[in-house]
Amino acid sequence: MSTPAGPGAQDPLVGDLRKAGLLPLLVLHFAARGRCYGNMLMERIGTLTQGALAVNPNTMYPLLRALEAKGLIEGEWEHPERRSRRFYTITTAGLAERDRLAAELAPRLERIQHSIESIRDELLSPV
C-alpha cells in the first residue's frame, strides 16, 4: 500500500473539495478580509481546517500567481527595492469569483458535513 503524498492528497472528502476549487476559494475568502501573503494564507488554511487541508509552498505560490494573472487578486511587494513578502488584495473580479465558487461548493460542503455527522452519531450512539 502506498503512502499518500500529503494530508488530504488522497482523502476522498478533502480531495474532492480540492478538485472543486476549495483552495482558490479559501485564498479569495481570506484576501477579501484584508491584505495577506503566502505563508499567512497557508497558516490560516491549516488552522481553519485543523490540518485536514495542508498547503505547501509548491501549491500556494503557483496558485497565487495564477489568481493574480487572472486578475482576481493584486500583489504588491512589501519592500519593492528588495524581494520580501508579497501582499495580496482581492479585486472586484475576485469578489465575484469568490461568490461563484462559494455557491458552487456549498452543496458539497453540506453533503460532507451531513455525512460526518451521520458517522459520528452512528458510532457514538449506544449499542
Q: Where are the model-predicted features located?
A:
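Short, hydrophobic-biased segments on the C-terminal half of alpha helices
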Residues: 61-65
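Basic, amphipathic "hinge/linker" alpha-helix immediately C-terminal to the N-terminal HTH DNA-binding motif
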Residues: 82-102
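Amphipathic alpha-helical dimerization/coiled-coil segments
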Residues: 96-127
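N-terminal helix-turn-helix DNA-binding core of bacterial DNA-binding proteins
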Residues: 14-59
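Beta-hairpin "wing" of winged helix-turn-helix
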Residues: 68-84, 89
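Short, Lys/Arg-enriched N-terminal segment that forms or immediately precedes the first helix
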Residues: 1-16
